[in-house]
From Swiss-Prot:
Originating species: Paraburkholderia xenovorans (strain LB400)
InterPro entries from the UniProt entry: Ribosom_uL1_bac-type, Ribosomal_uL1, Ribosomal_uL1-like, Ribosomal_uL1/biogenesis, Ribosomal_uL1_3-a/b-sand, Ribosomal_uL1_CS
Keywords: Repressor, Ribonucleoprotein, Ribosomal protein, RNA-binding, rRNA-binding, Translation regulation, tRNA-binding
GO MF annotations in UniProt: rRNA binding; structural constituent of ribosome; tRNA binding
Function: Binds directly to 23S rRNA. The L1 stalk is quite mobile in the ribosome, and is involved in E site tRNA release. Protein L1 is also a translational repressor protein, it controls the translation of the L11 operon by binding to its mRNA.
Family: Belongs to the universal ribosomal protein uL1 family.
Gene3D superfamilies xrefs: 3.30.190.20, 3.40.50.790
Gene Ontology BP terms: regulation of translation; translation
Alphabetized CDD domains for the sequence: Ribosomal_L1
Protein name: Large ribosomal subunit protein uL1
Subunit (UniProt): Part of the 50S ribosomal subunit.
Gene Ontology CC annotations of this record: cytosolic large ribosomal subunit
Amino acid sequence: MAKLSKRLQAFAAKVDRQKLYAIDEALSLVKECASAKFDESIDVAVQLGIDAKKSDQVVRGSVVLPAGTGKSVRVAVFAQGEKAEQARAAGAEVVGMEDLAEQVKAGKLDFDIVIASPDTMRVVGTLGQILGPRGLMPNPKVGTVTPDVATAVKNAKAGQVQFRVDKAGIIHATIGRASFEPTALRSNLNALVDALQKAKPATSKGVYLRKVALSSTMGVGVRVDQASLAAQ
């Protein structure tokens, strides 16, 4: 831990916590810090100008990152008949109905995303206490309850990320890996910011995107000048 501490201390000394860095410089600093022995994720935290306690200001949605996430995902789909075949053809690892529900109840959750056709919600609805706490419960707001299960599977495989504001009014998301080129990370961040803008609640007043900060898994936060994002 001593080496890690010294590394982080050295990096932290390079970062001015009060400064807003242009996106290219911010990405350079974050990638420089990502020197662990694994391919660290590059994460973003966005402080929103909303009241997360108000139900009409809960920001939630999904976006397909143009450069992907760098992570392989296993997809489970609740579907039957033709839609089940479409889900399999699109690349879903697990497809079923009551049999899949029994698998979930048995604790066999070897998948990262769950998608459901609307006509299967009578089955999926009984699994809320299991899937909900794990962030796996299908929801139409993020595109995981849909009649077009094939497209949903393809989006999940292509690098779709879901986002939901926390109690502090902050969105947390992963926009790639340290091994990504800066241009790929920048395009992913822009896609996320665009999606957040589109998801802005009508009742939100004042500045909506208040703060944007980047970090790697084992790194420190670097604040981003939002004007540099708009200039891309």
